[in-house]
Amino acid sequence: MATTSDFRNGLCIEFNNDLYTIVEFQHVKPGKGGAFVRTKLKSLTNGKVIDNTFNSGVKITTARIERKTYQFLYKDGAGYHLMDNNTFEQLDLDEKAIQNPLLIKEGQELDVLFHQETGNFIGCELPPFVELKVTYTEPGLKGDTATRALKPATLETGLQIQVPLFIDNDEIIKIDTRTIAYVERVKTDI
């Protein structure tokens, strides 16, 4: 058990029969009345973010979450297949269990979350950035880099995103997994 004074970003709590992580919190002491804590909570089961206010000093049940690194092996009709690199134990996941499945490619590592007391699977977390190869995009015009113009590009996983005009086919680009947006071109050693 913890109280609202123990709140910190990333803390996992049990609230309304669900598991949540604290995304943001603010301790408020108004001039009149008791203190309270405003929070933004993200559900670990469905990814929804809710706002909630706790009275100061309220006891909250914390949840212990275990993170394990798994390697993505392959995808087939049954779902996504991952392997624990330490024990070589395989885990089969439904497509809904991965937040953005088009951002992962074979051999990539993911963090898999388990509830420590029950051992139940909670979810997957992608790394903040991934590097993917551009398989198709229209050719850009030479010298047209002064503006922030974008064009569509198809990546090796089938994902389509907007990239700057200077990106060509077979280039590797870095993508932010939180916003699913182009970040930069990856420099390759030739």
Curated annotation (Swiss-Prot):
Family assignment from sequence similarity: Belongs to the elongation factor P family.
Pathway(s) it belongs to: Protein biosynthesis; polypeptide chain elongation
Cellular localization per UniProt: Cytoplasm
Organism: Amoebophilus asiaticus (strain 5a2)
InterPro entries linked: Elong-fact-P_C, NA-bd_OB-fold, Rib_uL2_dom2, Transl_elong_fac_P/YeiP, Transl_elong_KOW-like, Transl_elong_P/YeiP_cen, Transl_elong_P/YeiP_CS, Transl_elongation_fac_P
GO biological process, one term: peptide biosynthetic process
Domain of life of the source: Bacteria
Disulfide bonds: none
Keywords noted in UniProt: Cytoplasm, Elongation factor, Protein biosynthesis
GO cellular component: cytoplasm
Sample GO molecular function, one term: translation elongation factor activity
Alphabetized Gene3D superfamilies for the sequence: 2.30.30.30, Nucleic acid-binding proteins
Annotated HAMAP family: EF_P (MF_00141)
Main subcellular localisation: cytoplasm
Name listed for the protein in its UniProt record: Elongation factor P
Function: Involved in peptide bond synthesis. Stimulates efficient translation and peptide-bond synthesis on native or reconstituted 70S ribosomes in vitro. Probably functions indirectly by altering the affinity of the ribosome for aminoacyl-tRNA, thus increasing their reactivity as acceptors for peptidyl transferase.
